[in-house]
Amino acid sequence: MPAISHITAPAPSRPFAGPFANDAFAIAANKETTVTIDLPTISWPDGLGPTPKPFADHAPGSVISGPLSEQCDVLVLLYTTFEIQALLDVFTNNPAWTAARQKSWYGYAHNFDKFKSIIQGIDDDTALKDGLFGYVFPLMVGETRVVLYKTELHPKTNGTGLPFIPVIQQLVSELQPKLVISTGTAGGIGSHIQCGDVVITDAARLHCKLNYPKYPAIDTLSKNNTQLTNTVTVNDKYVAYAAQNFTKLSLPGLAKCYAEFATRQGYSFLKKNSSAPSIYVKGVNPVPGPQPMDIVSADYLTVDDNNNSEGLQSLGTMNDTDDAFAFYAINQLSGTKPNWLSIRNASEPQVDVPKFPPGTSPTQVVDKLKTLAGAIYGVYQYCTTLNSAFACWGVIAGM
């Protein structure tokens, strides 16, 4: 049985840096203590356990200031501290994301000076202050070459110049992956997604409030709710294996998360996980309900509720702030492009609230939803992400 524990995230890689530090969602999340568990050693099938595979041309712990000269089959994009800790727990049986662990990875700094002028919020992030876009780490899953990339740039926090986009394009051009996976926490859209469930999809939509002068197509895509698509055939053999054998390992942690809310007023809609969370795959076993199997990526923090107050329910099944931006970046590359997938876990479900009284302002409505959802995210973000990490392994193992 996994042991329940609590860990404290290090200062870097805050998910709510810059203008989002005072958002109602962030304030609620930051008041909570994130529940974590210590996973048992995982028995991987068919010799498919992840194993480190250092770059041949770079010493572990070195800073890569020029182009990466080695290629991979899969590039996995990671965003927040708790998200990478959960994936590391699954992939390496060691969730630590300490300064020492970061120094054992490879700092990615190619062309930092070129892009520095368009990066806002450098002083809010230790890695950016050190001239690093993020950290990369190579490993193998069977015969599949994988590179993990923990980005310190985020679409929602580093300004309307969107430095995240050219850096992703540069990294993809150097590594030449066949598949890019963007993964981590998300909010559930619709009533069928519960905490810990995972959605794997090759479709995304942008949902933006800001204008991006350098990327006017983003404004148009968002305004028209245009679907970004590619065609990825997921061999679900090991995804199904993960759903059958691995997602149940998150249940002790999810039970502890639920206990944090069992007696809180206003959270009766939150359901206790009575069975292993589901992994839904677009085109294989879609999420029940009318919502399209899309990831909806906003440049602000969004929440679905039973009144569809933010109009998300016609757009997708999960909402985040990253994936569609990454996929837009990939789609704009010339020549051969990699396929891409969003693999997201629900860290908070649809919020269920009574009808708001007449005269309630839109801001009051959204802040109420964010306060409820942000608290759930704050508690559940680690334990739910274990399941998207299992799903990532399943997709990679099936290649």
Task: Locate predicted features.
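Intrinsic-disorder/coil detector with helix-boundary
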Residues: 2-370, 379-399
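Short glycine/proline- and acidic residue-enriched helix-loop micro-motifs
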Residues: 374
